[in-house]
């Protein structure tokens, strides 16, 4: 039977990871290793300056752990290299995240980081996120659509094989709409997220300042001279976006021009 490792950045008790397990439990043997507490926007952080403690969850056949103060990357690293080191995983899936991970969000995202860590460890990986309404960020319409999409995607992978080669992963974003309103999937590049750079300054009872970094509505910039619509465009039209991500961040188009710019300085 196929074996899938699940993680997230919303925490072990989050509704999204429970919905993900429910969607896949009849398709594969499911293992879950997730942070004990929410670790949203922790990016690719791993813990190297403090010990990590893994708590085995009772009644889960030894397949569930939560990691005290662990990040998604910690969870996947520990799962593959220690907790389940004798298990050969067919997939790592991170999610279902509460909120989008599109455009530059993928750099900040702990959800995407969990899938990146799976890729680094040599396992085909997927990150999946559920878009929330700007009017009510805490209540997605439901996970029904996200569950259907991940079931179909995983079944396709089991049938045809993982579609990417090398150090690459799939990033999936699911629109906040009903199954009836859903328009299907689009294969998209990342778009450009617009950040308003909000900082909220407050004063505590001791008259000391503290800050909350701003969270703002989903806004994006149109890609210029692009044949394909972006992940943002797909979501805006009630499509799911499926974006292939590459761990290699090198800007190959700029290597030659950079050499020319740097000519005379290179030895």
Swiss-Prot record:
It comes from the Bacteria. Its EC number is 3.1.3.5. Its cofactor is a divalent metal cation. The keyword Hydrolase applies. A divalent metal cation binds at residues 9-10, 40, 97. Binds 1 divalent metal cation per subunit. It is found in: Cytoplasm. It catalyses: a ribonucleoside 5'-phosphate + H2O = a ribonucleoside + phosphate. Keywords: Cytoplasm, Hydrolase, Metal-binding, Nucleotide-binding. Coiled coil: none annotated. GO terms for cellular component: cytoplasm. It is an enzyme of class 3 (hydrolase). It holds the Pfam family SurE. GO terms for molecular function: 3'-nucleotidase activity; 5'-nucleotidase activity; exopolyphosphatase activity; metal ion binding; nucleotide binding. Belongs to the SurE nucleotidase family. PANTHER family: 5'-NUCLEOTIDASE SURE, 5'_3'-NUCLEOTIDASE SURE. This is 5'-nucleotidase SurE. It comes from Helicobacter pylori (strain ATCC 700392 / 26695) (Campylobacter pylori). The lineage of its organism: Bacteria, Pseudomonadati, Campylobacterota, Epsilonproteobacteria, Campylobacterales. The gene is surE.
